[in-house]
Structure formats: C-alpha cells, structure tokens
C-alpha cells in the first residue's frame, strides 16, 4: 500500500465492508493479510483502490506462490480472507441472490385473511451447506472417519474453488419488471397500501455530510454539521467572502447581522475588489472624480438595499461628506416617494431610506424589484452632489518616466491619472502636455526641447517613439568616444538639429572634420603652419636647415667653406637721408699702398629741406 496512512485507511475500509456482511475480523489479521499480498503482488495498487478484476489477479498470484513455495509459505487465513473480499466486491452476484430471495418470497403466501400477518422464516441454507440430522451418538463410524481423513488430505490438492466464479442464470430486464408487478399485486391483495408520490411528508432533517475515507478511518476528526444558510445582502456576502480570504474589512464592520431563514430569494455577492477600489479612489482622487463616479455608476446597476448604500458611503467617505450624502439621499428619496404616492406605487419613504419598520436588512431584502432601482438612483444622485475635490493633485508629481520606459507608455499612465482627477478635457490636455515634458527622462527632454512650444502631445509621442534603451546606449558610447558628458552630447545634437545641419548632408566641420562648429569658426584654421625642412642645400646629406648645417664636406666629399656666424643677412633696409650737416667724403678707390692718407676736409653746410 505504500504509506502508513493509506494502509490504515484500506484496513479500515476492509473491516467495515466485512462487518457489513456480518463478519468481524481484527485489524491485526487484516494488516498481516495485506503485508502478505504486498510480498506476493508488488504491483498491487498503492492508492488502495481495488475492483473485482484486480482482486482476481491477486488470487491468481497467490495460487502461483502456493504452487512454487508450498503451503508453509501461505498463511492459513489467506484463502478465507481472499474469498470473503471477493464476495464483497462481486456486486452482481449479491444483487441476483437478493432478487432470487424476493422471487421465492413471492411464490409463498404472505398471510392468511383470518390470521395475523407474520414474518417468513429465513430461507434454508444451500444444499451444499445442509447438515445431516445429528444422532445422539457423536462418535463417527470407521468408514466415515476414513472418508473424512481422505478428504482432508486432498484439501490442498483441489483446484482452488475460491477462484471459480459462480455463473448463475442472469435475470433479464423484462423478468425484473414482471417480478416488480407481481410483488405490487401481492401487496395490494394483502391490504398493504403503497405511499403515493402526491402525498406530502414532513421534511426530514438534512443528512450528515458524506465523510471522507480518512474521517471514516479515524485519522481525521469528523466535520461538524454545516450552519443553517443565511440570506444576506450582496454587500454582506462580499464581505463574508473577503473576510474568509484574509482581507481587512474593518471599515465594513457593521455588515454581519443575524438573519432569519424565511426568504426564498436568490442573491449574488458583490466582488470585494470593486468595493476596495472604490474606497481607494475616494481617498486618492476624491468622491466626485470621474473615475470614482464611474465606479459608483457601475455599483448602481446592482440591486442594493438602503443599508448597503449607507454602509458603503460610511466606509468610503469622510465624516462630513457622509453627512452631506445622507441628507441629500433622504431628500432624493422624499421626492421619489411623492411621485410614488401620486402614481399609486406601494413604495413608501420609509422603504426607500430603510428606516422605521424597514430598518432591518432582512426586511429590506423583500422589497419589490422596482424599489431597488429607485434606491440606487437616489444614492447615485446624492453622490454626484458632493463637493468637488480639485485639490487632490499630489499624485501627478509621482507619474514620472523611467530610464528604460517607452515614452508612449509614460504618456498613457499620465493621461489615465489626469483623467481620474480632472473632468475638463481641455484643461487636462494642457496639463498633460506640460507634465509630458517635465516628468520625462533626460533623453526625451533633450529631444523634445526644440519642439516644446511648437508641437502637441501627438508630436511628442512621434519624436520620442525611437528613444529607448538602445538609443541611450548609443548616446553613452558617443560621449565616451568624444570624451564628453552625456549632457554635452545631447546639447550638441540639439544645437545641430536647431541649425538644420542635418539637411546639408554633412554635420562636421569642413576644415577639421569635427562636429559642433563650422569652418568659419574652426579653431585650427588660424593656427600658423610649421614647415619641416627638406634636403639641406649646402651639404646635400640630410634634412635640416642650411643655417644649422655644420658639415665640412658635401655629399661628394668636396670641402665646404666655413659658415660665418651671421652669414644670413636680413632684409635690406631702405636708404636713409640725414638732413643737416654732413661730412662729404670723396669717392676714391681703395688704396692698398702704405702711403699716408690725406687729411679730412672741413664740414659743409646744406640748407634744410622745404618740407619735413
């Protein structure tokens, strides 16, 4: 059987089944019997469920085990237990035997008219079990004693009659119908009246619930009788279910009165999730927000009694708002009651407000269907007349776009929150456009900044449609390659988009090729170019300037003249004219002789120029 729990359960079921047939067997013997079956038949069902076919296979396996190992390996009571359980599982034969007994009883007269009816004696035992009349002498003759010993020796050599199934003549359906008719006629002749289906009998107490097998085996305690069903309103049913599921229903604590079982109507419970969302909407968005009003309209389609509306309003509204709603609700009910009085409708003011003789909830459950529609209409109209709560906008600041969230999803969340708070569509769109830019992430803000005052919300969504995680990775890689921050890269793209450089087909500088500036303002354009020296013209040996050449010979080995320190003369100056007294030196050829030179001549005076 596997587990101990399943073994005990199966033993208990076998014990009950055998006891039903008048056979008492101890549980110890049944446990030993099942242990032997587990040893012989390892495939025996572990779930403890058997039928007649399975039990026959068990018998064949026991027979094989007996043939191979002999009678010493088979307990004595195994054959008896197997036969008894086989008879319990063979339901068809049991029913046929009962029908046969009924047929036999039908053939005998039930009673005589002049005598008191008496019970028939039990049917005689089958011929195989009939005992011979006992003699006074209990001793057996030698012949009978020898025959008994011979039969006992052949006991284990028989072909196991317990495996053979009795095959009696099956009773057809027509025979059973005919038998039932004969029994009915016999009962009528005997003066016994059969109960008619039209007679009404007092209702019997409900049967106890069907116990599970574990309870029947004594492993689990039996469950108690179910409490009598109570008719509750839809709100009270919803709160019952929520309390069983572990929800906190402290705000609806007045929803569990005692009821009488005198109502035959059928009621459905409200989903507690709807009530919970209504309370959250009233606390976050206000009682007159569009989202809250939509939930009240949905709740108004249910047939709620007045006490349910009062309890819902008390739990969802503040103290002041509840008093305002209650006074407005009573006023609406008074108007409806006046109209009902004029139209001859039997729905009074006390019924609509649930006061006076209609204060109990079980009494309110017996109203006419039209009364619930009027009560719901009055409750909805009173709810709509509560003061608006336009100051509940603190949650809008929490609606921000995540770093990897698509922009369209962020705008959808923003519009949903604004729609629950503001009823004016135009004002809501203006606020949505403002928050769609301010609460967006840095990448979307950089893309939307040039179009902040030009485009609308649809343009914002179209511009930021491609901005996602891959876009942010590209911006980060560009910033790393250029050695700039992400903010500088975004500003650079914004400036490029603003100047329209993308339309020119080249977004970089024509001089240096770097993005971010034009060729006119390129910083590399005004830098002085540094020329590198070529082959030296003096020595023809290396690349250096001639003024830096220090070679003595040229490339062919010819000696080079020495380089003076200032052989590179500068740019010749223009001749200067000195006005005033000048010393005129005669132009004479250079004399290389050693003769003494002539003395210098005297100074001469020259008139000043006309103009300076």
Swiss-Prot record:
Q: Which InterPro entries match?
A: B_retro_matrix, B_retro_matrix_sf, Gag_p24_C, Primate_lentivir_Gag_pol-like, Retrov_capsid_C, Retrov_capsid_N, Retrovr_matrix, Znf_CCHC
Keyword presence, ATP-binding: no
Per the annotation, the residue ranges of the short sequence motif PPXY motif are: 208-211
Record region (Disordered): 103-148, 589-612
> Is Coiled coil tagged as a keyword?
yes
The source's superkingdom equals Viruses
Q: Where is this motif: PTAP/PSAP motif?
A: 202-205, 287-290
Which chain positions carry the site (Cleavage)? 99-100, 129-130, 168-169, 256-257, 477-478, 579-580
Per UniProt, the keywords (alphabetical) are: Capsid protein, Coiled coil, Host-virus interaction, Lipoprotein, Metal-binding, Myristate, Phosphoprotein, Repeat, Viral budding, Viral budding via the host ESCRT complexes, Viral matrix protein, Viral nucleoprotein, Viral release from host cell, Virion, Zinc, Zinc-finger
Annotated GO MF terms: nucleic acid binding; structural constituent of virion; zinc ion binding
Q: Which stretches are zinc fingers (CCHC-type)? A: 507-524, 534-551
Where are the N-myristoyl glycine lipid anchors? 2
Family annotation (Gene3D superfamilies): 1.10.1200.30, Human Immunodeficiency Virus Type 1 Capsid Protein, Retroviral GAG p10 protein, Zinc finger, CCHC-type
Q: Which GO terms describe its biological process?
A: viral budding via host ESCRT complex; viral translational frameshifting
Instruction: Please give the annotated consequence of changing residue 214 to S.
Output: In strain: JSRV-21
Q: Which GO terms describe its cellular component?
A: viral nucleocapsid
Among Pfam families, the record links this protein to: Gag_p10, Gag_p24, Gag_p24_C, zf-CCHC, zf-CCHC_5
SMART domains, A to Z: ZnF_C2HC (SM00343)
Q: Where is the composition biased (Pro residues)?
A: 119-128
Q: What name has this protein been given in UniProt?
A: Gag polyprotein
